[in-house]
Amino acid sequence: MGVNDLWQILEPVKQHIPLRNLGGKTIAVDLSLWVCEAQTVKKMMGSVMKPHLRNLFFRISYLTQMDVKLVFVMEGEPPKLKADVISKRNQSRYGSSGKSWSQKTGRSHFKSVLRECLHMLECLGIPWVQAAGEAEAMCAYLNAGGHVDGCLTNDGDTFLYGAQTVYRNFTMNTKDPHVDCYTMSSIKSKLGLDRDALVGLAILLGCDYLPKGVPGVGKEQALKLIQILKGQSLLQRFNRWNETSCNSSPQLLVTKKLAHCSVCSHPGSPKDHERNGCRLCKSDKYCEPHDYEYCCPCEWHRTEHDRQLSEVENNIKKKACCCEGFPFHEVIQEFLLNKDKLVKVIRYQRPDLLLFQRFTLEKMEWPNHYACEKLLVLLTHYDMIERKLGSRNSNQLQPIRIVKTRIRNGVHCFEIEWEKPEHYAMEDKQHGEFALLTIEEESLFEAAYPEIVAVYQKQKLEIKGKKQKRIKPKENNLPEPDEVMSFQSHMTLKPTCEIFHKQNSKLNSGISPDPTLPQESISASLNSLLLPKNTPCLNAQEQFMSSLRPLAIQQIKAVSKSLISESSQPNTSSHNISVIADLHLSTIDWEGTSFSNSPAIQRNTFSHDLKSEVESELSAIPDGFENIPEQLSCESERYTANIKKVLDEDSDGISPEEHLLSGITDLCLQDLPLKERIFTKLSYPQDNLQPDVNLKTLSILSVKESCIANSGSDCTSHLSKDLPGIPLQNESRDSKILKGDQLLQEDYKVNTSVPYSVSNTVVKTCNVRPPNTALDHSRKVDMQTTRKILMKKSVCLDRHSSDEQSAPVFGKAKYTTQRMKHSSQKHNSSHFKESGHNKLSSPKIHIKETEQCVRSYETAENEESCFPDSTKSSLSSLQCHKKENNSGTCLDSPLPLRQRLKLRFQST
């Protein structure tokens, strides 16, 4: 069909167009093309009645839902030039007949098939037009006149009739529904072919009216001829060939070929160009090289090129002139002269439901309910288009509601329930529950029925609001895990309680202040968990931190459980024979009233007492945070009141800072034995008191000396167990990052390891503050604190290095202090309540003793400044300090501190 090899020539301009892109366009369809395609499908033959009608209906329904308007073209009387082609087609389809082919030029059978299709188009309301001759000629006429946007046909003759856009290879598969598009503008711009050239190709290559064309001429020679003409009309060249004799050809002047340079391809030799230059290259010497495709502009090359082109044209001319009737003016007139006219205006009508039921039942044997179901989509689409354009009447379908939203082929749609239209047939089984449902595009339905869409959107919002109200609030108001992690990352909790083992402590986690939480809960919770009632031994920083942040109950329970498990394990290593020998137990009157508790039972009773206390505290802790702030704030106020009593008695003539520090000093020095307090009075002057110095450091040093004197071998026995738990701290004096509070916490734990001595364990509250603030506020004092702490560690090293069983290693000394602290926790806990009551009975005496100790310790600090290394200086200064103050040994006594204080109060 059409021009031979035309689609192969037009292949470079083919475009792949999805059917969705045809939406909104009007397409002229060659009806005979679709009928022939349906008849060639072998699977439909015999299994489907009237396959051409079924194929036509479903294609129309598919394209109509895509908003593609169709105009079908009916074949007219074929021209006589096509009689030979029609006869051969009929013979191939229906077999040979006895009549002559020249007498049978009509399409009686094919026209009867087309009439059935036209009857269906009338039932569907689709317009169709009658062509005068060929259907493709009418399609081209409609396209050229602007009545349609393109022509849907596989016949290439459409371009020869004047069509501008042709759609070919209509495909309706689910994966890729598309058509191939060819436009006349792209053919002319890319291939250089216009309508005259295409008609000339039809004559040379062959078409329906001239099946053989010019024998011996193929598409390559024909295209080369068109290129030789350079835009000249091919049909005019045919007429010129006909006017002149076919055997005559213009004689070209023969010129002699000159020698050409191998470098520039110009006449002359390379040596000549090297000496004299090239005239065509416009050079005095040498010449310019050119590529292989360069054509020399000399006279011989021009004549040679013309000769070659003329040979191609002469060859085609000879073959064309040999054909009888060339240049076939009848064929040229068939393509160029228009015979078609538009008789009636193209109009679309509403599908007729009753007429369609009758037609499909008669021709296709469709049941009425099936025909109504298939036609409903076309009815709703037509009514929506009319309402969108502003035309409304009572016959239009009315939607009941929007069932739900759908997505079809990537397009947002609504599932619509419609009212039953007139003459709509239903299946017998559907009378009970019947609903007319279709899926329509959201944009089109909203434009046609905006009020229905508004109601649906309102109902959707109401349902969404009800669902949100039904959501119950979470019963558990605990923060989310992400919030807890963010909360803990800004927290700095520094527990310095003496009874907590550093390695197993669960309180060394950072806590940041939160303004929304009560500030008294942490302080009170820790005090209620760790301290017995009426314990006066508080850290100095409790007076500065009036309130702390709440601590998670889970952390408190975890810490308490670890303490119970740790305290329940017996520590047999503390009963060392060397330690007992150094205590001089033979000189003690065991029958007297000097000891309130038996030393033999002290270690065993501690673990049970501590375990019972911790378990009682854990049982009192609720699961939430409702009652904790009030309970804990009461405990904090009780301890703060005891501290204020000490400060109020000696506040005359002293600044608030000095007054506060002096009260702290009393709390720190009251833990020292009587020997150490008298020892510090006699060894240091009274006029070097500096309140800014860490007063806890002096008490730590003094108690440590007592600890070392009584537990030398006991410390050595624990060197090989807990060393990994304590990190070494070898920082120099210039370190500004090491915090004094942390060093005090680590060193002060050592001081409680005095066996069989009644000394209160000082429980320090948590220093809760931001890390940067804590570092900035304590930089000035941290330098002095760091040096003193390191010096005190050296004292412990000096004492233990003298033992035969211990090695002079600083790490072992630190390990020893850890075990000393751990062993002292067990037998000192039972004296919390008893010793705490008597300590605050004489605040004035303790304050005076503290002032003397501070002045004395400042002198020792000045002596240590001459040593560059902190460890060596602390060792030497302590040894000199011991030698010069042997006078205080006369006050040595084996009695515990509590009994000595008791005797002193009686004497005064």
UniProtKB/Swiss-Prot annotation:
Binding site for Mg(2+) 1: 30, 75, 134, 136
Binding-site positions, Mg(2+) 2: 155, 157, 208
Enzyme kind, highest EC tier: hydrolase
Enzyme Commission number: 3.1.-.-
Any GO MF annotation of the entry: 5'-flap endonuclease activity
Protein localization: Nucleus
Cofactor: Mg(2+)
InterPro entries per UniProt: 5-3_exonuclease_C_sf, GEN_chromo, HhH2, PIN-like_dom_sf, XPG-I_dom, XPG/Rad2, XPG_DNA_repair_N
Region (5'-3' exonuclease domain): 208-384
One Pfam family hit: Chromo_2
Family: Belongs to the XPG/RAD2 endonuclease family. GEN subfamily.
Protein name: Flap endonuclease GEN homolog 1
